């Protein structure tokens, strides 16, 4: 619930006794907290009078004006006094004023937050107001889903096709549904009380997220739900649940270009102030009646958070402070390709985005992922204070809560396999499990115990009834036992008495759909869109530059000194120029597709959270782009109009400008609508290409109006480009330049030209065209709004379930025996991660690590790392050129020693690891790094090291087993045979417990496939199968629950025990995980080390060191040493103690020991040799090629949004073309017949090619991110990767071009001659191939998919212009004729037309010229040149493929 409810909810208007008399200046006898500023006798009389006068002036204002005014103390007044301040409008507080106000109210969040909230509560209580509260009940709640199980669930080409047909048959009730019902939650019930913090625990897959979504009213409609959820006795249909409660997702979806402050401010503005304003007015009224004068600072704060419509509300600054985000408030959020804040900070932004709003109930899903334990503790503590003091209702799901964080909660809900095992007070949970025979060991966190005690694999170690043999207690038995436990009985009794609705506070539940007025939401979205346009200005500048270049080319290509107004042929050339101008703006609008699609995930999240209606998003997107459209069209029209030699009439110039402006706007609106319809980049690209194709073919230029078949004439009349083409042609050809009468007729040349292409000849068609285009602009924007308003986000978080996993789940619930030999080996393992594990267990787990390796040590001395100073910091007055992130760090990592690299968020842990592992791509590195005494060489180091990145990056369309097989194939030495390799993979899978997931698809994070913890285990396994000597792990337990973290740490410990060097950054370890480490490398914020040394038994060495520092508080018995260590070494503690822990460390014996150790390791051992490998990579070039092709083949087969959609796109386009150009290929008696046939070829080549090029780009962009990780790991060189990416396309394009070619060739009616047929297939195949490879090349040459799509659209336009259809090669000026030979599309058209018609001698009926002569003279096409054309077309495919390979090899756009 709202932190700023730090103020309140609406009052219950209940008075608690008489107020003090109006004449009294003295507060009544409330002494608990000094909430109110009372004139002190020690103050000077003048100050007292001045203060009194200001308050008196405020008191005289009407209530609505008084709540907007407050007295702000001067910046240097640290006492919170308003005496020296001034009266201000609270809605207009500046950044510095807000900052100083918060400093006075909450100087240090850890220490002052609770007293601040108590002051707020005291002020509310004082006048007899109450906070609204919410009690959430859920009764007999069951949730089921339908899913395919096993291999049928994999999204392969075949499965997707079958599933689509099956879904259609299910709708028609032809066949039964073959999906299996999966039970997610089973008959759960409980009560969540206000003012109590509830912790939701449970292993992955237990149903935690589903329960939270159900309680927050955000379940998807595809789930089957029974039972009910009520708020204060009201059903979900009686109020707006999405605004009464806030759900905080575990997935961090944010706009990367916005800063942290901007992200939270936007959210606060959208969610509004709720009922704070109403409460404030009542509060002010009562205080005035009682003559109570509140503390000025508190008064200003409460007023400021109650006034809506502020660009940046002070509540944003408050939330930034309590979440520890104030240090990065003005840094952009960023993403994988755009450097921004850290993963832990991004997770806090996700939390802050919702708690700035006024919701009274909060459901938080895994909000601590990526955070260190002290930060998690502080955040949960702050949330707990808000909950208990201000009457909130809070449920938080945490994966690995430390004991001190666990103790902050009042109630526990423990879920396991969809059953509630326990819900009730935290104090009784251990009592319940002890009654079942299980006891939590000493030095074991209770939360960790609870996560593991219901697991079949972990339960036995906690069995406490030594006099009885252990038996597995299934989940169902726990759930039944809880019903008879006294806590369960109390809960049942409570549920049997319905909530009394009459006691529900009227302001508890929200009935309004949105948090602010519609006008305010529109203003907010306009402000954000302007901000994003400013941040993305490069895109618009680049687009304008492209248009300028194209315009210059058009001007010089259609130069008026070369253009004539003599014949109908001259007119057709001018018509081509007009057509191209129109097409250029259609292509320009194509780039809107990528920009709109990229923003959709964030839009859908905010829409579902009811931040704003879809129209508030679409109107700014449309309206704010109009000035850009005006500028872009001005470039093309005003520069080229007179140079080309269009009719020299100013009126016609501006009419052409208006028409092309409408085309530009229509195109942008159309592609935004298609983006909303497709929702994924691949599908949207395919739909957009299809739409573009249909519109242009039916525009009246490619195919004459008179030749459109009757069954397609409706398409002609609804095509916006038909109206545009007719209007722009009428505007030109009815001008005086074309008024000359054609010899032997009574019609002008202009009208003859229009008639020859089947266009309309009346002037009214210009205004009809303008009206139609304006209508389409409105219609497409309305459709865009409707699509965004009603369609669901694409892709669901899903996991492919195997039969084995289902059986195991059923057995865990019921207690039945599992007969699965594959898992039996691991079923007896425990999660004991301590170093004194049973010898038998250790040797059993280590058996998968027996491949030979060389133990290696890493030493580094005085490592400094800096980056260029961010512009945001320079703007705030920082004058240095570089920002130093690591300040002379030294240390060593040794074989057989497991080192924990720790520190608070922002300490530089990941930065140090990236520097040591050689993963930094930018910045400035200084210092020495040696490997077993020899200077580090990155190429060699990559062969012997592994790096588990914090972001789990994997190819999404392969299974878990295939990911491991691929890694092992490429990274294990070539002398390891296939059988050994497979056995090694199996052993690693067993160690990391991935066997049940072996056939699960990896998927994309947050979209589909593996869960966070499963993905994390896969990341570790991928590195382990490489058998490295040195392993770096960046937060291997982040995002895992306690049990999964224990599995991972057991694996890591076993890896170390084989003699490897392992270093892990770790954020929030439990006691047993922390003490699984041998040594600690502790850093503080700012990039300096403060402890480097052994932990000792039960962390005794670490504790002894820090307790030896004067002033440091002693550790409490049983307290987590990791948490204590982080708490006592904060910067705030340094200020309190007046010391620097860095200096303490540098002056210690430990530092001298480490320096000696570094010197020793930095000298090569006697008789040793530097690392040397005869080849750079483990495998030969040919093996790398085969492995990359193997993975790409699997990826393509399982990527139906790409392969299936593209296949059916080719099929539909073929049928469409066949019906539009039906039998036109057999007609060749007139010039127009040849133009029609060539039009079918031109349209197919250009637009199918564009579709293939556009749709491959997002696929390559996703895989390129994986490629950067795999190349950095030394798996392969760039060329084999490019080989796999290129070669895998060959069979797909072959099948698709063959399907298209056969259908189109037959339906259009080209000549049935084997040679001509195969020439047609040949040219179509290589054309689609070179377009596909060009799409890859565009991604390879640019940093992002967005830029690639804009660059591509530029070249599509150029190729269209020089294709030979818009203007034939002989008609081009001599200075541009050369480029037609460099344009691949012109070669394709040459080949297609010349192979079909170039050998025909029959004369044309309308001119009498033989066909072959006409083709040679008008187009420059010769039949005997076909061999050269064939080689050239294949050559372009080869050129683009080779260029893509070189771009991948030489360019790296990843910034680290």
Curated annotation (Swiss-Prot):
Q: Which residues form the ABC transmembrane type-2 domain?
A: 520-733, 1183-1397
Which GO cellular component terms are attached? membrane
Instruction: Give binding positions for ATP 2.
Output: 903-910
CDD domains assigned: ABCG_PDR_domain2
Report the superkingdom from the record. Eukaryota
- Any stretches that span the bilayer, and where are they? 538-558, 571-591, 626-646, 658-678, 682-702, 768-788, 1202-1222, 1242-1262, 1290-1310, 1317-1337, 1347-1367, 1378-1398, 1425-1445
Location comes to: Membrane
Listed SUPFAM superfamilies = P-loop containing nucleoside triphosphate hydrolases
**Any idea which positions bind ATP 1?**
202-209
Q: Region entry Disordered: which residue ranges? A: 812-844
Q: Which residues form the ABC transporter domain?
A: 169-442, 858-1110
Q: Where is the composition biased (Polar residues)?
A: 814-835
Provide a Gene Ontology MF annotation, just one: ATP hydrolysis activity
What keywords appear on the UniProt entry? ATP-binding, Membrane, Nucleotide-binding, Repeat, Transmembrane, Transmembrane helix, Transport
Coarsely, its chief localization is membrane
How does the protein's chain sit in the membrane according to the entry? Answer: Multi-pass membrane protein
What is its biological role? May be a general defense protein.
Q: What is this protein called?
A: ABC transporter G family member 44
Q: Tell me the gene name.
A: ABCG44
């Amino acid at each position: 619930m709202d932190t700023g409810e730090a103020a309140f909810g609406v009052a219950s208007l209940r008075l608690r006794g008489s107020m003090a008399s109006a004449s009294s200046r003295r507060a009544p006898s409330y002494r608990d907290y000094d909430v109110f500023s009372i004139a002190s006798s020690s103050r000077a009389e003048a100050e007292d009078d001045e203060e009194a006068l200001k308050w008196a002036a405020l008191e005289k204002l009407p209530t609505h004006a008084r709540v907007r005014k407050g007295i702000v103390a001067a910046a240097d007044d640290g006492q919170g006094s308003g005496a020296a301040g001034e009266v201000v409008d609270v809605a207009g507080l500046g950044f510095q004023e807000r900052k100083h106000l918060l400093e006075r109210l909450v100087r240090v969040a850890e220490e002052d937050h609770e007293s601040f909230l108590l002051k707020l509560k005291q002020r509310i209580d004082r006048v007899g107001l109450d906070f609204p509260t919410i009690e959430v009940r859920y009764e007999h709640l069951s949730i089921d889903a339908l899913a395919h199980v096993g291999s049928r669930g994999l999204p392969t080409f075949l499965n997707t096709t079958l599933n689509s047909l099956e879904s259609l048959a299910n709708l028609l009730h032809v066949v039964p549904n073959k999906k299996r019902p999966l039970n997610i939650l089973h008959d759960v019930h409980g009560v969540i009380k206000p003012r109590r913090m509830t912790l939701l625990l449970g292993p992955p897959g237990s149903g935690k997220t589903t329960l939270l979504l159900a309680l927050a009213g955000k379940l998807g409609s595809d789930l089957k739900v029974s039972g009910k959820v009520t708020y204060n006795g009201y059903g979900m249909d009686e109020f707006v649940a999405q605004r009464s409660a806030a759900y905080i997702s575990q997935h961090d979806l944010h706009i990367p270009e916005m800063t942290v402050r901007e992200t939270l401010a936007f959210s606060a503005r959208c969610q509004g102030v709720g009922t704070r304003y109403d409460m404030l007015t009542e509060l002010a009224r009562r205080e005035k009646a009682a003559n109570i004068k509140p503390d000025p600072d508190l008064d200003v704060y409460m007023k400021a958070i109650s006034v809506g419509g502020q660009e940046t509300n002070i509540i944003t600054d408050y939330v930034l402070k309590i979440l520890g985000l104030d240090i990065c408030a003005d840094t952009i959020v960023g993403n994988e390709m755009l450097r921004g804040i850290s993963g832990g900070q991004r997770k806090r932004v996700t939390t802050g985005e919702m708690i700035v709003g006024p919701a009274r109930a909060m459901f938080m899903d895994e909000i601590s992922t990526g955070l260190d334990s002290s930060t998690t503790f502080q955040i949960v503590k702050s949330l707990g204070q808000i909950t208990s003091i201000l009457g909130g209702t809070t449920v938080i799901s945490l994966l690995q809560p430390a004991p001190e964080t666990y103790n902050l909660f009042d109630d526990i809900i423990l879920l396991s396999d969809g059953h509630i095992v326990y819900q009730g007070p935290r104090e009784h949970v251990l009592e319940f499990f002890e009654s079942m025979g299980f006891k939590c060991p000493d030095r074991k966190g209770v939360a960790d115990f609870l996560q593991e005690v219901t697991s079949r694999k972990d339960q036995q170690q906690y069995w406490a009834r030594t006099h009885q043999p252990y038996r597995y207690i299934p989940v169902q038995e726990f759930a039944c036992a809880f019903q008879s436990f006294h806590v369960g009985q109390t809960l049942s009794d409570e549920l049997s008495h319905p909530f009394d609705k009459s006691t529900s506070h009227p302001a508890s539940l929200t009935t309004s759909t949105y948090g602010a007025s519609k006008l305010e939401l529109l203003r907010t979205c306009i402000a954000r869109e302007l901000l994003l346009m400013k941040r993305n200005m490069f895109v618009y500048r680049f687009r304008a530059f492209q248009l300028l270049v194209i315009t210059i080319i058009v001007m010089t290509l259609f130069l008026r000194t070369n253009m004539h107004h003599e014949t109908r042929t001259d007119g057709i050339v001018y018509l081509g120029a007009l057509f191209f101008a129109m097409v250029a703006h259609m292509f320009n609008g194509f780039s809107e597709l990528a920009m709109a699609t990229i923003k959709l995930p964030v839009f859908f999240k905010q829409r579902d959270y009811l931040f704003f209606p879809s129209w508030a998003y679409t109107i700014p997107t449309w309206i704010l782009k109009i000035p850009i459209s005006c500028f872009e069209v001005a470039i093309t029209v005003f520069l080229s109009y007179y140079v080309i030699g269009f009719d020299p009439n100013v009126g016609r110039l501006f009419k052409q400008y208006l028409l092309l402006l409408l085309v530009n706007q229509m195109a942008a609106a159309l592609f935004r609508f298609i983006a909303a319809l497709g929702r994924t980049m691949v599908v949207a690209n395919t739909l957009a290409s299809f739409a573009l194709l249909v519109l242009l073919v039916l525009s009246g230029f490619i195919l004459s109006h008179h030749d459109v078949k009757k069954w397609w004439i409706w398409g002609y009349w609804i095509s916006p480009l038909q109206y545009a083409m007719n209007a722009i042609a009428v505007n030109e050809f009815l001008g005086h330049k074309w008024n000359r009468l054609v010899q032997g007729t009574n019609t002008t040349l202009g009208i003859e030209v229009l008639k020859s292409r089947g266009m309309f000849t009346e002037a009214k068609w210009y205004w009809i065209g303008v009206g139609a285009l304006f209508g389409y602009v409105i219609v497409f924007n309305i459709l865009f709004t409707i699509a965004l308003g009603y369609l669901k986000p694409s892709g669901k978080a899903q996991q492919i379930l195997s039969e084995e996993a289902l059986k195991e789940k059923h057995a865990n619930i019921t207690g039945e025996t599992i007969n699965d030999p594959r898992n039996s080996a691991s079923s007896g393992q425990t999660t004991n991660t301590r170093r004194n594990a049973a010898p038998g267990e250790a040797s059993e787990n280590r058996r998968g690590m027996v491949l030979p390796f060389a133990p290696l040590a890493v030493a580094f001395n005085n490592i400094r790392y800096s980056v260029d100073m961010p512009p945001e910091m320079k703007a705030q007055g920082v004058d240095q050129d570089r920002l130093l992130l690591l300040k002379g760090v030294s240390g060593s990592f040794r074989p057989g020693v497991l080192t924990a690299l720790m520190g608070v968020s922002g300490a530089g842990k990941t930065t140090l690891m990236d520097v040591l592992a050689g993963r930094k791509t930018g910045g400035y590195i200084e210092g020495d790094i040696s490997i077993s005494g020899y200077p580090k060489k990155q190429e060699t180091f990559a062969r012997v090291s592994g790096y588990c990145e914090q972001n789990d990056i994997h190819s999404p369309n392969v299974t878990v087993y295939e990911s491991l097989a691929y890694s092992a194939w490429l990274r294990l030495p070539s002398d390891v045979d296939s059988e050994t390799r497979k056995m090694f993979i199996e052993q690693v899978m067993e160690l990391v417990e991935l066997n049940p997931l072996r056939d699960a698809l990896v998927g994309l994070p947050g979209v589909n496939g593996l869960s966070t913890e499963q993905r994390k285990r896969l990341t570790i396994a991928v590195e382990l199968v490489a058998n490295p000597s040195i392993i770096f792990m960046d937060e291997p337990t982040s995002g895992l629950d306690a049990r999964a973290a224990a599995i991972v740490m057991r694996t890591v410990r076993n890896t170390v025990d084989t003699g490897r060097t392992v270093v892990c950054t770790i954020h929030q370890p439990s006691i047993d995980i922390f003490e699984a480490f041998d040594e600690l490398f502790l850093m503080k914020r700012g990039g300096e080390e403060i402890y480097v040394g052994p932990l000792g038994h039960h962390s005794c060495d670490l504790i002894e060191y820090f307790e030896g520092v004067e002033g440091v508080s002693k550790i409490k018995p049983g307290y987590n040493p990791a948490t204590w260590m982080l708490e006592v070494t904060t910067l705030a503690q340094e200020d309190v103690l007046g010391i620097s822990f860095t200096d303490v460390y540098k002056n210690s014996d430990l530092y001298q020991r480490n320096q000696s150790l570094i010197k020793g390791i930095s000298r090569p051992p006697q008789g040793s040799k530097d690392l040397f490998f005869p080849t750079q990579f483990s495998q030969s070039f040919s093996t790398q090629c085969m492995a990359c092709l193997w993975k790409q083949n699997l990826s393509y087969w399982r990527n139906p949004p790409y392969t299936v959609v593209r296949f059916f796109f080719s099929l539909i386009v073929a049928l469409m073309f066949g019906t539009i150009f039906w039998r036109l290929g057999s007609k060749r008696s007139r010039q127009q017949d040849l133009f029609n046939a060539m039009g079918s070829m031109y349209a197919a080549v250009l637009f199918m090619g564009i579709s293939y090029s556009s749709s491959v780009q997002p696929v390559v962009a996703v895989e390129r991110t994986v490629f950067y990780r795999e190349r950095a790991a030394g798996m392969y060189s760039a060329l084999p990767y490019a080989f796999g990416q290129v070669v895998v396309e060959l069979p797909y394009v072959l099948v698709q071009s063959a399907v298209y070619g056969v259908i189109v060739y037959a339906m259009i009616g080209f000549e049935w001659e084997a040679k001509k047929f195969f020439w047609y297939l040949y040219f179509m195949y290589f054309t689609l191939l070179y377009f596909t490879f060009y799409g890859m090349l565009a991604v390879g040459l640019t940093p992002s998919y967005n830029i690639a799509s804009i660059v591509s659209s530029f070249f599509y336009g150029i190729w269209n212009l020089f294709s030979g259809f818009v203007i034939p090669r002989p008609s081009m000026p001599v200075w541009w004729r050369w480029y037609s030979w460099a344009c691949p599309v012109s070669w394709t058209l040459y080949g297609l037309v010349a192979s079909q018609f170039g050998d025909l001698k029959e004369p044309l009926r309308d001119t009498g010229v033989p066909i072959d002569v006409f083709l040679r003279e008008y187009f420059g096409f010769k039949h005997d040149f076909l061999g050269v054309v064939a080689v050239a077309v294949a050559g372009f495919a080869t050129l683009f493929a080779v260029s893509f390979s070189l771009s991948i090899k030489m360019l790296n756009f990843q910034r680290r």
